[in-house]
C-alpha cells in the first residue's frame, strides 16, 4: 500500500468513525426515553382485559423500547419501586396499585413529570462495607431533599431482592429508607467486572466489563443523572455521549494512580526487565484512558485529601471537584459511647476491615506475635478481635488462612485472637464500646471509615502512617476550641510504618515506630491518658465525619445538579 493510500485510509476511517459517533449520539438518547407509538392505547387495552381480575398481572414487551416504557411507568406510578426488573427481566409489567387507578396511570404516561431519576451505579450495593454506607446515605439524602426524587439502584446482587437489600441496610447502617421511591435494576453481567473473570490484562478486562455493564443498565432503564459511587470511569464516555446524561462521581480511590506507576518504576531491575517495562507502558496507556474519562464528569467528589490530590492531578480538566468525607454515623456512635463507662473498657483491640489481603491482617498478627514474645508483662497483652464482612468464597477461605497463620504458624494463644465474620451492627458496637484500641494496617488506605468508627466509639486508633488516616482522620484536635490543631500534645491516636511498605525507604523511620513497638507503647498508657486521647478523638470525629456533615455536602451536589439540569432544558 502506498503512503498516500494509507493516509487516505486512516483519515477515511477516522471520518467514518466520527460520523457514526455523531449519528449514534443523536439517535440513542431518544431511543432510551422516547415512548413507542400508541403506548397509552396498548397499556390501556391490557389493563381493560385484566379489569375483571386485578390479580392478573399484565406483562408487556416493547422490544428495544422496554427501557423507555419502564421509565414512563416509574414516572407515572403511585409506587415506583414496583418497576424493578427482578421478576420479569427486560419485559415490563403493570403494578397492582396502577392497575387499580388505570385511568390516572394511563393519562400520566409520556407527559412531563417533575420527578427525576437519580441512577446510582453500584454493582455491589449489598456488600455492607464503607463504600456501601456512602451509597445508602447518599440515597437517603437524595430522597429527603425532594419528594420528586426517585433513586434507581443498578446492582449485580441477583441472589437477593430489593427488600432483602433494604433490610440489610437497616440492620447494618440503621438507615430507614423510603422504599417506595427506590427502584432496583438487577444487572446480569456483573461477572464482567470481577477480577477473576480476567486472569490476564485484568484492568483492561474490567474496564471493558464496566462498559458492557453500564450499557446493560442504560438499556434497562435510563436515569436523569448517572451517579457512580463505586468507581467505573470507563463507562462515562458512553453514558455522556450516547445517553447525554450528566455524570456525578464519588471516588473512594483512583483506578490507577501515579503511586502505582512510581512503585513499578522503582522495582529492582526495572530498566532491564522487559516484562516490567511492558507493564509500565500498559499502565501508562491505561492512565491516559482514565484521564480521558474525566472529560465527561460534571461533578466529581472524593472521600479524602489523598484521593482528591490524585483525582485533581488525573482529571485536571474537571473543574468541579470536592472533598466529601464519608458518613460515619459518629452522632449515634458517640451517643452510645457516652452511655458506657470508659473505666470498664477491656484491654482489647479491634480490627474492622473486610477480609481481603490488602487490609494486611497478617501484618497485624505477625506484629502482635512479636510483641507477645518480647514483652515481659504478660498482663498488659491485649486481646485482638478481627471483625469484617466476607463477600464470597475467596474471602471466607482467606479467613481460614488467617486462623491457621495465627494459631498454627505463629502459635498465638487462641484466647488472645478472635475472628468475627459478617458481624451484626449492634454486636459490633458492643465490642467497640468495650474496647480500648482500634487498628488499621492498610497502606495508603484512601479514607478509613473504620478508623472514624473507632474514634467515635471512644477507641484509640493505631494506624498506618499514610493517606486518609494520616492526612484527614487521626489529626491533633484542640478540645477547648473544638478545631484541628498542630500541637502534637493534642494527639488523637498513633501511627506506625512497616518495612514491607512500598515506600518504606522514603519514610522517616525515626518519626514512626513499627506496630510491634506501638503495641508496647500504648499498653503502658494509664487510664487518664487513654480517656484524654479518647475524648479528643470523639470530638474530632463528630465535627468532621458526622452523617449530618455528609448530608450538607451531598445536598450541595444535588443543588449543583439541579442547576445544571435547568440550564440544559431551559
UniProtKB/Swiss-Prot annotation:
InterPro entries in the cross-refs: ALG11 (IPR038013), ALG11_N (IPR031814), Glyco_trans_1 (IPR001296)
Reactions the enzyme catalyzes: an alpha-D-Man-(1->3)-[alpha-D-Man-(1->6)]-beta-D-Man-(1->4)-beta-D-GlcNAc-(1->4)-alpha-D-GlcNAc-diphospho-di-trans,poly-cis-dolichol + 2 GDP-alpha-D-mannose = an alpha-D-Man-(1->2)-alpha-D-Man-(1->2)-alpha-D-Man-(1->3)-[alpha-D-Man-(1->6)]-beta-D-Man-(1->4)-beta-D-GlcNAc-(1->4)-alpha-D-GlcNAc-diphospho-di-trans,poly-cis-dolichol + 2 GDP + 2 H(+)
EC identifiers of the protein: 2.4.1.131
Cytoplasmic side: 71-200, 222-446, 468-570
GO molecular function: GDP-Man:Man3GlcNAc2-PP-Dol alpha-1,2-mannosyltransferase activity
Pathway involvement of the protein, from the record: Protein modification; protein glycosylation
A Gene Ontology BP annotation from the UniProt entry: protein N-linked glycosylation
Xref: CDD domains: GT4_ALG11-like
Transmembrane segments: 8-70
Lumenal side: 1-7
Keywords, alphabetical: Endoplasmic reticulum, Glycosyltransferase, Membrane, Transferase, Transmembrane, Transmembrane helix
Membrane disposition: Single-pass membrane protein
Chief place of localization: endoplasmic reticulum
Intramembrane stretches (start-end): 201-221, 447-467
Enzyme class per UniProt: transferase
Entry's localization field: Endoplasmic reticulum membrane
Ribonucleoprotein as UniProt keyword: no
GO CC, any one term: endoplasmic reticulum membrane
UniProt similarity note: Belongs to the glycosyltransferase group 1 family.
Function statement: GDP-Man:Man(3)GlcNAc(2)-PP-Dol alpha-1,2-mannosyltransferase that operates in the biosynthetic pathway of dolichol-linked oligosaccharides, the glycan precursors employed in protein asparagine (N)-glycosylation. The assembly of dolichol-linked oligosaccharides begins on the cytosolic side of the endoplasmic reticulum membrane and finishes in its lumen. The sequential addition of sugars to dolichol pyrophosphate produces dolichol-linked oligosaccharides containing fourteen sugars, including two GlcNAcs, nine mannoses and three glucoses.
Xref: PANTHER family: GDP-MAN:MAN(3)GLCNAC(2)-PP-DOL ALPHA-1,2-MANNOSYLTRANSFERASE (PTHR45919:SF1)
Protein's recorded name: GDP-Man:Man(3)GlcNAc(2)-PP-Dol alpha-1,2-mannosyltransferase
Name of the encoding gene: ALG11
Amino acid at each position: 500500500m502506498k503512503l498516500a493510500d494509507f493516509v487516505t485510509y486512516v483519515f477515511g476511517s477516522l471520518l467514518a468513525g466520527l460520523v457514526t459517533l455523531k449519528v449514534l449520539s443523536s439517535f440513542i438518547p431518544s431511543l432510551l426515553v422516547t415512548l413507542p407509538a400508541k403506548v397509552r392505547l396498548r397499556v390501556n387495552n391490557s389493563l381493560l382485559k385484566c379489569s375483571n381480575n386485578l390479580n392478573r398481572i399484565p406483562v408487556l414487551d416493547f422490544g428495544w423500547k422496554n427501557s423507555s416504557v419502564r421509565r414512563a411507568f416509574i414516572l407515572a406510578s403511585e409506587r415506583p419501586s414496583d418497576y424493578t426488573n427482578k421478576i420479569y427481566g427486560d419485559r415490563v409489567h403493570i403494578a397492582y396499585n396502577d392497575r387499580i387507578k388505570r385511568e390516572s396511570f394511563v393519562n400520566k404516561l409520556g407527559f412531563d413529570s417533575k420527578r427525576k431519576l437519580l441512577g446510582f451505579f453500584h454493582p455491589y450495593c449489598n456488600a455492607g462495607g464503607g463504600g456501601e454506607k456512602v451509597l445508602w446515605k447518599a440515597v437517603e439524602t437524595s430522597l429527603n431533599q425532594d419528594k420528586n426524587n426517585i433513586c434507581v439502584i443498578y446492582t449485580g446482587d441477583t441472589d437477593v431482592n430489593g427488600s432483602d437489600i433494604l433490610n440489610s441496610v437497616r440492620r447494618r447502617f440503621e438507615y430507614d429508607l423510603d422504599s417506595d421511591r427506590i427502584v432496583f435494576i438487577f444487572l446480569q453481567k456483573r461477572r464482567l467486572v470481577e477480577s477473576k473473570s480476567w486472569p490476564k490484562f485484568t484492568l483492561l478486562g474490567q474496564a471493558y466489563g464496566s462498559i458492557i455493564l453500564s450499557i446493560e443498565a442504560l438499556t434497562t432503564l435510563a436515569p436523569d443523572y448517572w451517579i457512580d459511587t463505586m468507581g467505573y470511569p470507563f463507562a462515562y464516555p458512553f453514558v455522556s455521549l450516547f445517553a447525554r446524561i450528566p455524570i456525578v462521581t464519588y471516588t473512594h480511590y483512583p483506578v490507577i494512580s501515579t503511586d502505582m506507576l512510581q512503585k513499578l518504576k522503582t522495582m529492582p531491575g526495572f530498566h532491564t526487565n522487559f516484562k516490567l517495562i511492558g507493564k509500565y507502558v500498559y499502565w501508562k496507556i491505561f492512565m491516559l484512558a482514565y484521564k480521558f474519562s474525566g472529560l465527561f464528569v460534571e461533578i466529581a467528589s472524593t472521600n479524602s485529601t489523598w484521593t482528591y490530590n490524585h483525582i485533581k492531578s488525573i482529571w485536571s480538566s474537571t473543574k468541579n471537584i470536592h472533598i466529601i468525607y464519608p458518613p460515619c454515623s459518629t452522632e449515634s456512635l458517640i451517643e452510645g459511647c457516652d452511655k458506657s463507662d470508659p473505666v470498664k473498657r477491656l484491654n482489647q483491640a479491634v480490627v474492622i476491615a473486610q477480609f481481603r489481603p490488602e487490609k494486611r491482617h497478617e501484618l497485624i498478627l505477625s506484629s502482635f506475635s512479636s510483641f507477645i514474645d518480647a514483652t515481659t508483662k504478660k498482663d498488659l497483652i491485649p486481646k485482638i478481635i478481627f471483625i469484617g464482612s466476607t463477600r464470597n468464597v475467596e474471602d471466607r477461605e482467606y479467613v481460614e488462612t488467617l486462623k491457621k497463620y495465627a494459631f498454627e504458624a505463629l502459635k498465638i494463644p487462641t484466647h488472645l485472637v478472635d475472628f468475627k465474620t459478617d458481624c451484626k451492627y449492634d454486636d459490633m458496637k458492643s465490642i467497640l464500646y468495650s474496647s480500648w484500641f482500634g487498628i488499621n494496617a492498610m497502606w495508603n488506605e484512601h479514607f478509613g471509615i473504620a478508623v472514624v468508627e473507632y474514634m467515635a466509639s471512644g477507641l484509640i486508633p493505631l494506624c498506618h502512617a499514610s493517606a486518609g488516616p494520616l492526612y484527614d482522620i487521626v489529626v491533633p484536635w484542640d478540645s477547648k476550641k473544638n478545631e484541628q490543631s498542630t500541637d502534637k500534645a493534642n494527639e488523637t491516636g498513633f501511627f506506625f510504618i512497616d518495612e514491607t511498605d512500598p515506600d518504606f525507604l522514603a519514610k522517616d523511620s525515626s518519626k514512626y515506630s513499627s506496630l510491634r513497638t506501638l503495641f508496647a507503647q500504648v499498653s503502658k498508657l494509664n487510664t487518664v491518658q487513654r480517656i484524654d486521647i479518647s475524648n479528643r478523638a470523639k470530638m474530632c470525629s463528630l465535627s468532621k465525619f458526622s452523617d449530618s456533615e455528609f448530608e450538607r455536602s451531598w445536598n450541595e451536589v444535588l443543588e449543583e445538579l439541579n442547576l445544571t439540569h435547568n440550564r440544559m432544558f431551559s
